[in-house]
From Swiss-Prot:
Residue ranges occupied by any Calpain catalytic domain in the UniProt entry: 232-540
Superkingdom, natural source: Eukaryota
Active site: C290, H458, N478
UniProtKB keywords: Acetylation, Hydrolase, Nucleus, Phosphoprotein, Protease, Repeat, Thiol protease
Main location: nucleus
Gene: CAPN7
CDD domains xref list: CysPc (cd00044), MIT_calpain7_1 (cd02681)
Organism: Homo sapiens
Protein name: Calpain-7
Keyword hit for Cell cycle: no
Length: 813
């Protein structure tokens, strides 16, 4: 953080606050006093040497409290008339026309100028306001003059047109490759662009294109990948824009108080996109999206602290400086990371209000500021409406930023948690700007929640992490902007707050008692005790290289459970060149979600399992034992961290796994690495396959070779292979039985050489599945005897033969 820049912010906000205060514009004054206080808090964190900084913070916050009653009593300024709004839309049309004009998009510019002229003339005839008429006519003349000047070259004979006078308008072709949305702050140039994110940095395969096309339709609406052509999206119209998909479905709580849909100009006479990005200003209402609002809050805090466009960069239209701007025509575009790529979400600016005219969606405490409500609306549209089933910050932050999600469970039997190591890691990474953090509570009784001031299963934004003389603290924000922690170090704790600690944490309990803004300090020990999960989102810019593969796992491929066989699981080869000093490689598995019910009742438990098998296919889950085993969770994102300490080449097999495979899933595997690597799907070397359906029944259920009297009664198949080549044989039987098979050479054509054998088996008998892979089986005739371990174990089985050479198979017995 830059202390000097934050001091400048504080001075600017304080000046604006005092100015608005004197003008009687109390709502705006409250907003700027809060921002000035927040800027000073961050400045002190960054090492500011300003004198009396704590006194100034207290002064601003006390003035906020004093102004609250004035805000309630003061009547709002009159709203703009329809004709004034038409003038604003005409100005915006001309502004957009100027932009197209500068880019030499002549036809688009002429169209926008012409529409501005028509709107100005129409409105000037409708209004009796002479001043407004003059403004409209002047704007119409300017637009008309420029439109005529641009039209002249288009009307000249073809032979007289200069080769440089008018550029042909390129066709609006959408390529298959999404715009490199750059969620990676300060990404090194060597980073492999998402435009070409298969294993070798080539273009998408046909399968990947089909995956991205299929998962573009979310809750019945198509959200196409965000591409370069979308930067030319049209935002200016003579009439207010209306989303062709209609109004968003409301939640049950919204419906009880809903009155109507309004546009920003119906709420304020001075709507703007962003006054300043601030976590203090965000307020959640009755939509059940606490994790999303918490995600917005920490993204805003990050943008403020590190001056990186983490959240404001995703809203369009934008001005020439890349700043999002208010559009009086009511159309906006938000770029969200969904189902493998950044995607384009179009919304209008209609928002729900109650009978008092209060917004029923999240909003900024500065009522003229729109960014909070509009980003929330875009996300709610994708999620199927304001009747949002709820989420977690891993999902929401990934959608907003594209950063890498990680989940730390503090009370899990399957995941170890170290309080000391975790705090040290969070403290260091948070202050470096490497990570965004939220914390969520688990289930608790109403009495427990009331006692501690906590909301069950609720997400809180982490705004700060501090350590003071062995004491460790986390600053949290409740997205509701009220209701705070009531335990140790709350504003009402008279025992633990010392003057020294108050100064270090910039916290005055007496001032905090006057204003409940939902922001509080909690000790690390108490957070670990009363909260359930910490959600992290890591800056991908920490890794200089990355690539991804989009794919599909068909529900028909393999058994429902992969507890005994991984033969049908998607598998990938990862080869890493580890330098001296070691390196980190992270692998993110993301399941694509296209339906609100799937999102609300996620029953797909996915994970990634890592094996050290030199990139060869793995068939048995525990043989060899996993290098890194996965925990199957019903979250769409699963992060695997591989830490390398030894220099050289390391080769892994990555296996996608599910607890119970019920449905076909589409997914993305994305690899992030601090060093060079290659990543590819493990291909099958076999081009031919045959399946034999058999069964053990009655006498033919003879058991293994230990039972000599009955083993000879097992089914026997004979296969004939004409040329030497690789062969894979797989046996699948009832999971409750241990199965195996034996291959016996009957005869070979010529000298079999080193590949010849008398007998080979599938090894130890295993539950439900076994296999034998021969790199080179000599040409000849062979018998295969499948069996269960014990006699009299009846049931069906499948024998699968996979090869590159035709095989003839007959049943002998």
């Amino acid at each position: 953080m830059d202390a000097t820049a934050l001091e400048r912010d504080a001075v600017q906000f304080a000046r604006l606050a005092v100015q608005r205060d004197h003008e009687g514009r109390y709502s705006e004054a409250v907003f700027y006093y809060k921002e000035a206080a927040q800027a000073l808090i961050y400045a002190e964190m960054a090492g500011s040497s300003l004198e009396n900084i704590q006194e100034k913070i207290t002064e601003y916050l006390e003035r906020v409290q004093a102004l609250h009653s004035a805000v309630q009593s003061k009547s709002a300024d009159p709203l703009k008339s329809k004709h004034q709004l038409d003038l604003e839309r005409a100005h915006f049309l001309v502004t957009q026309a100027f932009d197209e004009d500068e880019k030499e998009n002549v036809e688009d510019a002429i169209e926008l100028y012409t529409e501005a002229v028509d709107l100005c003339l129409k409105t000037s005839y409708e209004t009796a306001d002479k001043v407004l008429q003059n403004k409209l006519k002047q704007l119409a003349r300017q637009a008309l003059d420029r439109a005529e000047a641009l039209s002249e070259p288009l009307t000249k004979p073809v032979g007289k047109i200069s080769s440089t006078s008018v550029k042909p308008k390129p066709p609006p072709v959408r390529a298959h490759f999404p715009l490199g949305a750059n969620p990676f702050l300060e990404r090194p140039q060597s980073f492999i662009s998402p435009q070409s994110c298969d294993a070798q940095g080539q273009r998408y395969t046909a399968e990947e294109i089909e995956v991205l096309r299929t998962t573009s339709k979310i809750n019945g609406i198509e959200y196409v990948p965000f591409m370069n052509v979308d930067l030319r999206e049209r935002f200016a119209y003579p009439m207010p824009f209306c989303d062709r998909w209609g109004k968003l479905p409301l939640s049950p709580k919204q419906k009880t108080t809903f009155s109507k849909w309004v546009r920003p100009e119906d709420l304020t006479n001075n709507p703007t996109m962003i006054y300043t990005v601030s976590s203090f200003s965000i307020k959640q209402t009755i939509v059940s999206d606490c994790s999303f609002v918490a995600s917005l809050a920490i993204s805003a805090a990050y943008e403020r602290r590190f001056n990186k466009k983490l959240i404001t960069g995703i809203i369009y239209p934008q001005n020439k400086d890349g700043e999002p701007e208010y559009n009086p025509c009511g159309k906006y575009m938000v770029k969200l990371h969904l189902n493998g790529v950044p995607r384009k979400v179009i919304i209008d600016d209609q928002l729900p209000v109650d009978h008092k005219g209060e917004l029923l969606c999240s909003y900024s405490n500065n009522k003229s500021e729109l960014w909070v409500s509009l980003i929330e609306k875009a996300y709610m549209k994708v999620m199927g409406g304001y009747d949002f089933p709820g989420s977690n910050s891993n999902i929401d932050l990934h959608a907003l930023t594209g950063w890498i999600p990680e989940r730390i469970a503090m009370h899990s039997d399957s995941q170890t948690f170290s309080k000391d190591n975790s705090f040290r890691m969070l403290y260091q990474r948070f202050h470096k700007g490497d990570v965004l953090i939220t914390a969520s509570t688990g289930m608790m009784t109403e009495a427990e929640g009331e006692k501690w001031g906590l909301v069950p299963t609720h997400a809180y934004a982490v705004l700060d992490i501090r350590e003071f003389k062995g004491l460790r603290f986390i600053q949290l924000k409740n997205p509701w902007s009220h209701l705070r922690w009531k335990g140790r170090y709350s504003e009402n704790d008279v025992k633990n707050w010392t003057p020294e600690l108050q100064k270090y944490l910039n916290f005055d309990p007496r001032t905090a008692q006057k204003i409940d803004n939902g922001i509080f300090w909690i000790s690390w020990d108490d957070l670990c005790q009363y909260y359930d999960v910490i959600y992290l989102s890591w800056n991908p810019g920490l890794f200089k290289e990355s690539t991804c593969i989009h794919s599909t796992w068909d529900a028909k491929q393999g058994p429902v459970k992969d507890a005994y066989s991984l033969a049908n699981n998607p598998q990938y080869k990862l080869e890493v060149q580890c330098p001296q000093g070691g390196a980190a490689v992270w692998v993110l598995l993301s399941r694509h979600i296209t339906d609100k019910d799937d999102f609300a009742n996620n029953r797909e438990f996915i994970t990634m399992v890592v094996y050290k098998t030199d990139g060869k296919k793995v068939y048995y889950p525990a043989d060899p034992p996993p290098y890194i085993d996965g925990i199957r969770i019903n979250s769409p994102h699963y992060l695997t961290k591989i830490k390398l300490t030894t220099p050289g080449t390391h080769t892994f097999t990555l296996v996608v796994s599910q607890y119970e495979k019920q449905n076909t899933i589409h997914y993305t595997v994305r690899v992030y690495s601090a060093c060079s690597f290659t990543f590819s799907k493990i291909p099958s070397p076999y081009t031919l396959s045959k399946r034999i359906n058999g069964k053990w029944s009655g006498q033919s259920a003879g058991g293994c070779g230990n039972f000599q009297e009955t083993h000879k009664n097992n089914p026997i198949y004979q296969f004939h292979i004409e040329k030497t080549g690789p062969l894979l044989i797989e046996l699948r039987g009832p999971r409750q039985y241990s199965v195996g098979f034996e291959v016996v050479t009957v005869s070979t054509l010529g000298d079999p050489g080193p590949h010849g054998f008398l007998r080979k088996s599938s090894g130890d008998y295993r539950c439900g599945f076994c296999y034998l892979e021969l790199e080179n089986i000599p040409s000849g005739i062979f018998n295969i005897i499948p069996s269960t371990f014990l006699p009299k174990q009846e049931g069906p089985f499948f024998l699968d033969f996979n090869s590159i050479i035709p095989i003839k198979i007959t049943q002998l017995q």
